[in-house]
From Swiss-Prot:
Signal peptide range: none
Keywords for the protein's UniProt record, in alphabetical order: Cell cycle, Cell division, Cell inner membrane, Cell membrane, Cell shape, Cell wall biogenesis/degradation, Magnesium, Membrane, Metal-binding, Peptidoglycan synthesis, Transferase, Transmembrane, Transmembrane helix
GO cellular component, one term: plasma membrane
Listed pathway(s): Cell wall biogenesis; peptidoglycan biosynthesis
Protein's UniProt name: Phospho-N-acetylmuramoyl-pentapeptide-transferase
GO MF annotations in UniProt: metal ion binding; phospho-N-acetylmuramoyl-pentapeptide-transferase activity; UDP-N-acetylmuramoyl-L-alanyl-D-glutamyl-meso-2,6-diaminopimelyl-D-alanyl-D-alanine:undecaprenyl-phosphate transferase activity
Organism: Rickettsia typhi (strain ATCC VR-144 / Wilmington)
This enzyme's EC code(s): 2.7.8.13
Functional summary from the UniProt entry: Catalyzes the initial step of the lipid cycle reactions in the biosynthesis of the cell wall peptidoglycan: transfers peptidoglycan precursor phospho-MurNAc-pentapeptide from UDP-MurNAc-pentapeptide onto the lipid carrier undecaprenyl phosphate, yielding undecaprenyl-pyrophosphoryl-MurNAc-pentapeptide, known as lipid I.
Length: 361
């Protein structure tokens, strides 16, 4: 909004001219989301406590140390969604189609997560919305997003770019729709599965969002895209502002979510954040790079799939002490803080590997 209001005055004012630069607006987005999180955090947490008598239900079969978390309010993802959306509406170019499509997906996945959190709190158990119902809703939203992208961009590509290999790509043709939906829904649920310890998912999400802030900027810049031999996609640079807002809001949320957490992001936060990252990866044509940068989310999800499959195949045996993987290490005797910090380190490594694919070909 500020960008659109100041646009006519760019050549007449030094301050207005600053808003012409995506990098300036992205930096400002981080500052605004951080500030909003610090200011609204205590108010929101107090409000959630007043509404939630028992807080987020704690699984009885989980690590014993988790029983001390009883009473901690959930739905803290509202803080992340609000601060990110406000900064984006203030600083991004509101005539940009990708901004509106991404915000639509972000909020829609957040609503699904809110419904799930609300069901858990109301029933006082960890069973929220049925899994099939959640997948169906996520699928419908993903289809709408894909159709919007196809309709608004007549030259949209169905090519899947393979990182680290020069000029290697796969034309998925009509199958690309299925692939894009899989990426968005899969990303949403992968982040959701990772969000099981205080601060565990928050930092990797920030790293991933920061990485895609850079990717969006490069892909949307003709000079940089040509130099790095990336697929140039006009107008995606504005997503840098949105991604930067996600980084700031996640860091701000971590202030309240660090161990011992004062609030959990809940499915409201994890489903929306995972979904928006999936959407951005589809828009920028860096779907495989998302799987690399978000490697921690992939590992956590894979551990659950393997555990369930092996349990059914062997009629009761388990590969891990508990899934997702972070609970396995807790059951193995690792302190929660050690699991979280080591997983953060792994996330940094994956982010560096993913970003290196932009140059190494």
């Amino acid at each position: 909004m500020l960008y659109n209001l100041l646009l006519p005055h760019i050549h007449n004012s030094h301050i207005a001219n600053l808003f012409h630069y995506i990098t300036f607006r992205s930096g400002l987005a981080i500052i605004i989301t951080l500030s909003l999180s610090f200011v609204t955090g205590p108010i929101l947490i107090k409000f959630l406590r007043s509404l939630q008598k028992y807080g987020q239900p704690i699984r009885s079969d989980g690590p014993e140390s988790h029983q001390t978390k009883a009473g901690t309010p959930t739905m803290g993802g509202i803080m992340i969604i609000l601060s990110s959306c406000i900064s984006t509406l203030l600083l991004a170019d509101l005539t940009n189609k990708y901004i509106w499509i991404t915000l639509f997906g972000f909020i829609s996945f957040g609503i699904i997560g809110f419904m799930d959190d609300y069901a858990k709190v109301k029933r006082n158990n960890h069973y929220g919305v049925r899994g099939k119902s959640k997948f169906l809703l996520q699928g419908i939203i993903s289809v709408i997003i894909y159709v919007l992208l196809e309709y608004l961009d007549k030259n949209s590509s169905h090519v899947l770019n393979v990182p680290f290999f020069k000029n290697l790509s796969l034309d998925l043709s009509y199958f690309y729709m299925v692939f894009a939906i899989f990426v968005i829904v899969g990303s949403s649920n992968a982040v959701n599965l990772t969000d099981g310890l205080d601060g565990l998912a928050t930092v990797p999400i920030a790293f991933t969002a920061g990485s895609f802030a850079l990717i969006s900027y490069l892909v949307g810049n003709l000079i940089y895209a040509n130099y790095l031999q990336l697929t140039y996609i006009p107008n995606t640079g504005e997503l840098t502002v949105l991604c930067s807002g996600l980084v700031g809001s996640c860091i701000g949320f971590l202030w309240f979510n660090a161990q011992p957490a004062e609030v959990f992001m809940g499915d409201t936060g994890s489903l929306s954040l995972g979904g928006v990252l999936g959407i951005i990866s589809v828009i920028t044509k860096h779907e495989i790079v998302l799987a690399i940068i978000g490697g921690l989310f992939v590992i956590e999800t894979t551990s659950v799939i393997l555990q369930v499959y092996y349990f059914k195949a062997t009629k009761g045996k388990r590969i891990f002490k508990m899934a997702p993987l972070h609970h396995h290490f807790e059951k193995h005797g690792w302190a929660e803080s050690k699991v979280v910090i080591r997983f953060w380190i792994i996330s940094v490594i994956f982010s560096l590997i993913g970003l290196s694919s932009l140059k190494l070909r």
